Amino acid sequence: MTDGHTTKSGYMSESGRVTGSCHCGRVTLSVPHAPLWAASCNCSLCARTGWLVVYYPDAQVEVTGETVAYIWDDRMIGIHHCPVCGCGTHWQTLREDFGKMGVYARLLDRFDVGAVEVRLMDNRE
């Protein structure tokens, strides 16, 4: 922490949580701590969007604001985005409890990709 409120890779609220939002600010996210690593996935969707995903237990992620879910053929996860600005915000499982959800790291305030390990995930269909 540098000034009691920031870390190298995110804004830390008074509660110690890291916050972020979509581009227009209508969807906000709060996670328990700054990410230590992020996943760079090569699935058909992530390869097109360039998302970096950080994972947290479902119960530790707070999402406020209305989102729209995109669900494709395998129907395993819902990819959520803001209906106003279109920013992808997070994904949640639909069929089974993975015990985690994915949050798009670049939405976290002051996220610095150079401050975290980026792990390549091979999920190409």
Residue ranges and their predicted role:
Residues T2-S21, R26-E125:
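A short Gly-Trp-Pro
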